[in-house]
Swiss-Prot record:
It catalyses: RNA(n) + a ribonucleoside 5'-triphosphate = RNA(n+1) + diphosphate. It holds the Pfam family RNA_pol_Rpb6. This is DNA-directed RNA polymerase subunit omega. The lineage of its organism: Bacteria, Pseudomonadati, Pseudomonadota, Gammaproteobacteria, Chromatiales. Promotes RNA polymerase assembly. Latches the N- and C-terminal regions of the beta' subunit thereby facilitating its interaction with the beta and alpha subunits. NCBIfam families: rpoZ. Residues 67-123 are annotated as: Disordered. The RNAP catalytic core consists of 2 alpha, 1 beta, 1 beta' and 1 omega subunit. When a sigma factor is associated with the core the holoenzyme is formed, which can initiate transcription.
Length: 123
């Protein structure tokens, strides 16, 4: 197995910083089960990702892709993020406005209310 060098990879990405970002993103995809584009020779996902970049199979375009990756789809059981959000009700969870009032009432009833200013509420 030939050693992958930064110079080999820089032919296919603009600079070292993009190389790190593209390599990390591709390594995460490989770790999640995406099919590698080069032979997997008992290497770690980061090495395979760099070998794919050096071979020209993966470029910095991986950083700007807006579509969901197949790895994300696999982790959601084949459903898109929108499908999952629609199933569980979508948007952010709204707080219950009565919850803080109920808590204050409960604390007052059992004597655990904070901020009364009197260290001994029995006097």
């Amino acid at each position: 197995m030939a050693r992958v060098t930064v110079e080999d990879c820089l032919d296919n990405v603009d600079n070292r910083f993009e190389l790190v970002l593209a390599g990390a993103k591709r390594a995460r995809q490989l770790a999640k089960g995406i099919e590698p584009l080069v032979d997997w020779e008992n290497d770690k996902p980061t090495v395979v990702a760099l070998r794919e970049i050096a071979a020209g199979h993966v470029t910095s375009e991986i950083l700007t892709s807006t579509e969901e990756s197949a790895a994300d789809s696999l982790s959601l059981g084949g459903f898109s993020t929108a499908d999952v959000e629609a199933e569980v009700g979508g948007g952010p969870v709204q707080p219950d406005p009565g919850a803080s009032q109920e808590r204050a009432f409960d604390e007052a009833a059992d004597g655990t209310a904070q901020g009364s200013g009197d260290p001994d509420p029995t006097t």
